[in-house]
A protein has these predicted regions:
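Solvent-exposed loop/turn segments connecting transmembrane beta-strands
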Residues: 52-64, 107-121, 144-155, 172-183
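Flexible, solvent-exposed coil segments and beta strand-coil junctions
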Residues: 42-45, 99-102, 134-140, 149, ...
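Short glycine/proline- and aromatic-enriched beta-strand/turn motifs that initiate or cap beta-hairpins
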Residues: 22-86, 191
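Gram-negative (and chloroplast) outer-membrane scaffold detector with strong preference
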Residues: 63-145
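Residue-level detector of intrinsically disordered/flexible regions characterized by low predicted structural confidence
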Residues: 4-7, 127, 158, 189
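Cleavable N-terminal export/targeting peptides
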Residues: 1-37
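Predominantly the C-terminal beta-signal and adjacent terminal strand-loop region
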Residues: 42-50, 153-191
Length: 191
């Protein structure tokens, strides 16, 4: 008798959670595509660099890094939304699980002349949500190809991101970047 009541309560609860509740939730919150576009304010925020430190034979040297994401595919957002983003990727779209192509110019204070201090990097990065679908914490792995004054090579990178990806800590390893194999970056990113 008690067993049949438990089964009945369980079936009613299952019916409510799987059929009635999701329909109510969907009706209250319709899914819409984001209405964001590049603007002057967005461009100004993109000019804020992220600080980084480069290992060298003289110790740590200071540098700064920017990043442009021309293409991103997100696999962690609502399936009713387009997973593709161009130039602008909302923090949740990126941190909830995505793959991006990126271009990253960097200023490294390891040469004597200003024109010789620029490193250009292009690559692919995957983001993996770790906590609260990536809003609280996520991680990334990437591989990139760089050019520094005619010296080319491959880099590998790992990162941890907090606060929907606004604050991140990245470590980049470039085996062929002689005497400066490691770069540590505090990444500041807004969109």
């Amino acid at each position: 008798m008690i067993f049949s009541r438990i089964i009945t309560v369980f079936c009613l609860l299952f019916f409510f959670v799987t059929i009635i509740y999701p329909q109510q939730k969907t009706d209250l919150y319709p899914v819409t595509e984001p209405d964001i576009y590049p603007s002057l304010m967005w461009a100004a925020v993109q000019l804020i660099p992220s600080p980084e430190w480069v290992t060298s034979t003289d110790g740590l040297k200071f540098g700064i890094r920017w990043q442009v994401t021309p293409l991103l595919y997100s696999f962690g957002i609502n399936k009713k939304l387009s997973p593709w983003r161009y130039l602008i990727a909302e923090p949740f779209v990126r941190q909830s699980g995505s793959i991006e192509l990126f271009f990253s110019p960097e200023y490294l204070n390891i040469k004597d002349k200003f024109k010789d201090m620029w490193l250009f990097r292009g690559g692919a990065r995957v983001y993996i949500p770790l906590w609260q679908r990536g809003e609280y914490m996520s991680a990334s792995l990437s591989a990139s190809y760089y050019n520094f004054n005619g010296i080319n090579g491959i880099s590998y990178e790992g990162g941890i991101y907090l606060f929907a990806g606004i604050l991140g800590f990245q470590t980049t390893y470039s085996p062929s970047f002689t005497n400066s194999e490691w770069i540590f970056t505090i990444r500041l990113r807004y969109f």
